[in-house]
């Protein structure tokens, strides 16, 4: 079945390119051995599409050059195909070159536009945590809103709510999690709500920005297959996946040999031999072995490693039992079951160990809350601050490090730090229970080493 899919894919791709491809001329730069592709805009485009290309070649040449180097530029997919919208679209506007015509465009291109040519990929994406769930945690969660606007946006210090200064911290979150796009009177985005990450919500009701992984305007499959594509969001103390990967044996091999690997193979054909070790995409998305390519990154996941307490995934976050089996199929591409079983056992038992610390922390938290011995501000209360540190920083390092073969992250930066934090939690708990009051001076330094 997989062979049939591959054959049909190759034939359809070949036919599509032969019918509508733009002509590209290869020129060699003397001495530098650099190749440049000069697109001749005289075949496969409507007059309107040509006008867009020629105008933007002058106004935004970097965008056009990037597009020319991508596969869309060589398959007659132009600005016109992706940016033109209906006149009654809430995002419809006209640039100076279009005024007086019936053509309306938008700088915003959502996954629904991509879905016209890539319906399967978009359908899978919309079922993943990269879609609606990612947006909710930033834009629909009361605690996150308080953190972004009242605390980080200095509303608590007198900054006017809703002012540019007040809302600017949101930009860093929406770069990955996505924004709720707001429009001005000309239907152009305002209030720093665009561009946004993979879970951006658009005024026409559509969701998702494929360009987060396939950066516009080259939209490269090779880029999305490299760990750097994931590492721009999955990094830092609260989700250090790229740091874990780089320190793992997989990351070591990518660092040493990655430039020699083939990242351009067609979907369903990208297999071991094109690479010597997996990138993020190989394990979580690629059609390796008996697996089919997927844009639903939940499908091969077992645990909710982001949460305060780790449980098997269920419901809209995926099927953890099925995910475990699917991920093991990916591992079979390079490893024996003996090797993989050890890795999965280390992951699972590290998670069980973390949960022991979290459960005891939750018990102490419950008793302190019942006795009114927790501060009202979680950012300044010593116990609440350490509790967040335990799960969001040290706890995630331990769990994710164990899941991705990052030994130091799992142990020294993870479990060892959990032990130290837990001892401080116990000390604060014991003081408050014994004295029936909150300590006058917090034992925790805000903004300490995380």
Question: Which residues does each PLM region occupy?
Answer:
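Short sequence/structural segments immediately N-terminal
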Residues: 23-450
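Bacterial N-terminal signal peptides
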Residues: 8-18
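Positively charged n-region of N-terminal signal peptides that target proteins for export
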Residues: 1-6
């Amino acid at each position: 079945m997989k062979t049939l899919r591959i054959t049909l894919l190759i034939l359809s791709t070949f036919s599509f390119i032969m019918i509508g491809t733009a002509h590209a001329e290869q020129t060699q730069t003397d001495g530098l051995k650099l190749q440049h592709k000069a697109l001749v805009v005289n075949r496969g485009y409507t007059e309107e599409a040509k006008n867009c290309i020629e105008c933007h070649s002058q106004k935004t040449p970097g965008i056009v050059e990037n597009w020319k180097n991508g596969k869309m530029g060589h398959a007659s997919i132009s600005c016109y195909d992706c940016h033109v919208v209906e006149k009654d679209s809430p995002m419809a506007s006209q640039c100076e070159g279009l005024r007086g015509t019936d053509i309306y465009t938008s700088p915003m291109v959502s996954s629904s536009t991509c879905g016209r040519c890539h319906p399967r990929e978009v359908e899978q994406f919309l079922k993943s945590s990269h879609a609606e769930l990612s947006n909710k945690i930033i834009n629909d969660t009361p605690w996150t809103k308080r953190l972004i606007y009242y605390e980080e946006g200095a509303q608590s210090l007198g900054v006017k709510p809703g002012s540019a200064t007040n809302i600017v911290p949101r930009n860093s979150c929406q770069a990955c999690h996505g924004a709720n796009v707001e429009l001005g009177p000309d239907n152009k985005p305002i209030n720093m709500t665009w561009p946004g990450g993979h879970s951006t919500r658009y005024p026409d009701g559509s969701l998702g920005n494929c360009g987060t992984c396939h950066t516009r305007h080259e939209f490269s499959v090779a880029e999305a297959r490299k760990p750097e594509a994931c590492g721009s969001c999955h990094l830092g103390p609260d989700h250090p996946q790229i740091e874990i990967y780089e320190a793992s044996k997989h990351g070591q091999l990518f660092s040493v040999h990655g430039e020699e690997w083939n990242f351009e193979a067609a979907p369903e054909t990208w297999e071991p031999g094109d690479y010597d070790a997996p990138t993020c995409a190989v394990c979580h998305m690629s059609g390796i072995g008996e697996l089919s390519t997927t844009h639903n990154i939940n499908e091969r996941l077992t645990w909710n490693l982001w949460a305060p307490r780790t449980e098997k995934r269920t419901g809209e976050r995926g099927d953890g039992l099925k995910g475990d089996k699917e991920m093991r199929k990916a591992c079979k591409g390079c490893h024996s079951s003996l090797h993989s079983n050890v890795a999965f056992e280390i992951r699972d038992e590290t998670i069980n160990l973390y949960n022991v610390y979290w459960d005891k922390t939750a018990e102490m938290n419950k008793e302190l809350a019942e006795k009114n011995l927790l501060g009202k501000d979680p950012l300044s209360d010593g116990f609440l601050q350490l509790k967040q540190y335990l799960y969001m920083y040290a706890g995630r390092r331990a769990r994710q490090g164990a899941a991705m073969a990052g030994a130091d992250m799992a142990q020294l930066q993870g479990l060892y730090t959990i032990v130290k934090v837990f001892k401080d939690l116990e000390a604060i708990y014991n003081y408050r229970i014994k004295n029936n009051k909150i300590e006058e001076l917090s034992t925790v330094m805000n903004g300490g080493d995380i």
